[in-house]
């Protein structure tokens, strides 16, 4: 009898499940708290702050860069793009000749090739490459020949940076910042953060400014050091007691490369904050609560930010207030049952006739443009232009102002 009853209820259960699943499913976009305008203003930019429109009328073409996925933002120097990929190869690509000049295997002898983080630094005719191994590999930029490799105490997942003409800084996953003399091939000093949080989260590389370096550790610390000596000037902890709940493998770290202007550093953190930090004393000038920030740029008096809620916003660099918020999604897509997430590049401001436009490149193949209306205010709805899909990085040439879009394996320009 029980079997008969259950068999009779089965259609009802299936109908109920169908009704339950037919509504719009919440995803990361819905769950991310949205930014709201706090003080509506007309945004104003000087001519020097507005780029020439990098998307020329000439049709772009796609060129192959690598057989494997590019894992870090490429370096550009003297008309050549240098990149490192997921299988341990470093490539040089000529932008003028539109071809690969050389390719070098820096993971010789490694059987399990699955690199996913790293960076390429060009300095004085040499490349300094990391790829989530323990090695810093130095290559001749012209030929691709290996000059030397240096083994570090732990894995290096971030891009190395030059502190001086001979001092290179690299950060390990175990919260060590190590200074390496490229002339003598010796380690000069080491600075360590507190006990690290085990995490797969990648955070930004150290940033050098005026003889000092700002570094973010997975312990939640931000430290400002003398780049020459490694002597600590100040430290600030991103994790406050009020932030601590259930132990997590998601550390509080800086997630956007710090932008330094006028003795202040601007950056977003993984625990939902945008901070303007006074570099003189390590004290925040202001803190703005803003969750899941993807990218950030500073243009004039405004911080332009994007987030996982598919928004772009202009914040006052003076007090952090939101002056304008735009939508990075078409109106027709908002009512869809499953709205896809997207990755957004750093916003930039470009010339648009006699005016300007705020531009955001998205991984879904769309360029979102926001232009002031007749009243001088910028609307929240964008003009959407189809470009290249799966863009991971972009680079605007300082020589001709042209846009270069880089996907996992190709470059479009």
Model-derived features: positions:
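Conserved beta-propeller blade signature
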Residues: 81-83, 126-128, 168-169, 213-214, ...
């Amino acid at each position: 009898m029980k079997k008969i009853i259950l068999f009779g209820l089965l259609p009802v259960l299936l109908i109920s499940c169908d009704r339950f699943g037919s509504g719009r499913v919440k995803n990361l976009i819905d769950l991310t708290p949205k930014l709201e305008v706090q003080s509506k203003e007309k945004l104003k930019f000087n001519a020097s702050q507005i780029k020439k429109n990098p998307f020329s009328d000439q049709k772009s073409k796609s060129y192959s860069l690598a057989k494997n996925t590019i894992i870090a933002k490429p370096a550009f120097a003297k008309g050549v793009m240098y990149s490192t990929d997921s299988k341990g190869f470093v490539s040089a690509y000529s932008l003028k000749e539109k071809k690969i000049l050389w390719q070098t295997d820096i993971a010789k002898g490694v059987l399990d090739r699955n690199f996913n983080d790293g960076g390429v630094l060009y300095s004085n005719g040499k490349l300094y490459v990391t790829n989530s191994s323990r090695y810093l590999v130095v290559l001749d930029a012209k030929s691709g020949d290996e000059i030397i490799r240096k083994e570090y105490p732990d894995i290096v997942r971030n891009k190395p940076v030059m502190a001086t003409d001979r001092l290179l800084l690299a950060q390990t996953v175990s919260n060590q910042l190590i200074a390496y003399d490229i002339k003598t091939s010796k380690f000069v000093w080491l600075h360590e953060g507190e006990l690290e949080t085990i995490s797969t989260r990648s955070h930004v590389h150290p940033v050098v400014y005026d003889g000092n370096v700002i570094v973010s550790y997975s312990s939640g610390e931000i430290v400002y050091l003398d780049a020459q000596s490694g002597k600590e000037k100040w430290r600030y902890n991103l994790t406050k007691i009020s932030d601590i709940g259930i132990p997590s493998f998601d550390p509080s770290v800086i997630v956007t490369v710090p932008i330094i202007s006028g003795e202040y550093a601007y950056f977003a953190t993984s625990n939902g904050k945008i901070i303007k930090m006074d570099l003189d004393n390590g004290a925040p000038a202001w803190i703005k609560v803003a969750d899941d920030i993807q990218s950030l740029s500073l243009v004039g008096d405004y911080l332009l930010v994007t987030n996982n809620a598919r928004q772009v916003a202009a914040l006052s660099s003076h007090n952090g207030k939101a002056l304008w918020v735009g939508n990075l999604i078409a109106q027709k897509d908002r009512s869809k049952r499953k709205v896809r997430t997207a990755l957004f590049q750093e916003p930039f401001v470009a010339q648009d006739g006699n005016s300007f436009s705020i531009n955001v490149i998205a991984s879904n193949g769309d360029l979102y443009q926001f232009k002031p209306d007749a009243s001088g205010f910028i609307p929240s709805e964008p003009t959407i232009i189809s470009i290249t899909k799966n863009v991971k990085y972009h680079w605007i040439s300082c020589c001709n102002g042209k846009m270069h879009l880089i996907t996992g394996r190709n470059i479009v320009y």
